[in-house]
Amino acid sequence: MAMTLLPRHGKTHLANIPYGYYTATVSLIFIILLIGARKLIPVRQRNRSKWAKWALSSARGGSPLLYLVVLFVALLVPFVHHYSLLGYVGLYLKRLGRLSYVLATLNLFLTLRPNFLLPGYVYLDLIPLHKWLSRSLCLLALVHGVGFLVKWALDSQVSFVAKAFYNIPNLAGLVVGALMAFMVLLSVRPVRRFSYRSFYLTHIIGAWVFVFLTAYHARPGVFVPYTLLNAGLFVFYILSKTVPARGVELVSKSTDDVNNCLTRIVLPRKAMPEHFAPGSHLRISPYRRVNPLYYMLPSHPYTVASMPEDKDVELIVREHASGFHLLTGLGYTIQNHYESVPRQCLQSATRIALVCGGSGLSYALPIFRHFASEEKADQVKYLRLIWLVRDKYDVNVLGNIRSLASSVAQFDIFVTRSVPPDDTVESGSKLSPAQQQSPITDDLEFELESFGDQLDQNGALITPEIPNLPSGLASSFHFGRKLDWMTDLAQFVEREDLGSTWLVACGPKGLNDAAKLYAQQNEINLASETYAL
């Protein structure tokens, strides 16, 4: 009697391997497109249609709406091929799983800090793309898992319990799917804002579990090359948090708990390298590198308010009761620093306006000082910093800022809660009366929520006291009104200098949206940073 050997797997067992390689190739082309778009597309789009401007600006800016549509069109067009969709449901469910795993390599690549392979991007540029690609991967993984659960439940020839729980590789996939669903839940904005630490911890654990447990779950295997590539990216992630890290203690901390104003924190100069760009960020962890929590819990980002030539590293922050506080006498770990301002702006701008709110001064001030330096004297034609603050006491953080020698630099401070009884101040600062609020800034979310006059118990206006400021730093104070973009920046834009005109904004989404609209209307360059989770 002859013995017949039957194949362990069906004829479609290896059918998804070529599609995995195709996805990897598309991912590589995707990275090349990101690099090429940033290098070849100019910052400003002129003499083009509305849609052409949007497409080019989105391509240069790494817009998730544009790039993810392009990516998934390229991936889904050949998704159903050779085998019918209804006849081979299991094959295409497996293909979804392989697609999500291969794209994880691209997603991890986008999170590298610093990413030397993506020149021209500052590290904040690609966060929206990473966020939406992560959600897409979770969705693909969930459809893959739920699809198989439904398939087994409807198939009378198989045991659902045996397939889902007794088959160990399938059980591993079930664990991954449950974790993906939990990650999606925690990524919803209200939940994420309620407990960012929980979101971050789950995010980190989920990434590692997804990479290594899926490698055990997947059939045919994905260890070579995908798991190896992902493991290599994890190694780089660990090295980037350990090799440049350095321990520090606070030099000093100046705060006013009574008035709840901005806090000035001074770190030793070694907290930053010898050379760094103005407006750079650093990330601080309360844990040492030997503590596992150093890698599992989020570090805290701060914008450096200092310049490389300063003797200390200064931070300007607004501390909240429930937030993270830097305290004197404790040790902290500086993980790394990252540039946040486009180099083209720092190198070639000739007309610069900086608009910031509250602690956003830490972003704008070093950029302002950079352009007010003697080295930029012949280059800069217009330089103005507009700082929007809630209370007059916030201005005290400027007490140790040295004077500026620039002949074109202007510093305007809008104090929104205190209105003087007249237009005179003994210090000689110029005061503007309250004016009609510009509708473009009506939705500011953080510092500017209160514009009421300060009144005493008899209803009289309280006269503001101007803190002492270094000479040459502030050119005017404005009490009790918002910024009117068109009026207060009336001398900013010159048609012959549009290519080298930069508007720099830092604050909540409302402020940055207003800045974006102003930049679009005037066809100038924009660099902005939003302070939000």
UniProtKB/Swiss-Prot annotation:
Main location: membrane
Domain FAD-binding FR-type, first and last residues per copy: 240-366
Any Gene Ontology CC annotation: plasma membrane
Transmembrane segments: 17-37, 61-81, 102-122, 136-156, 168-188, 198-218, 220-240
NADP as UniProt keyword: yes
Domain Ferric oxidoreductase residues, every copy: 96-213
Annotated S-S bridges: none
Keywords: Electron transport, FAD, Flavoprotein, Ion transport, Membrane, NADP, Oxidoreductase, Transmembrane, Transmembrane helix, Transport
Compartment annotation: Membrane
Membrane topology: Multi-pass membrane protein
A GO biological-process term: reductive iron assimilation
Enzyme Commission no: 1.16.1.-
Entry's Gene Ontology molecular function annotations: ferric-chelate reductase activity
Keyword Heme annotated: no
Recorded family membership: Belongs to the ferric reductase (FRE) family. AIM14 subfamily.
Function field: Probable cell surface metalloreductase. May be involved in iron or copper homeostasis.
Protein name: Probable metalloreductase AIM14
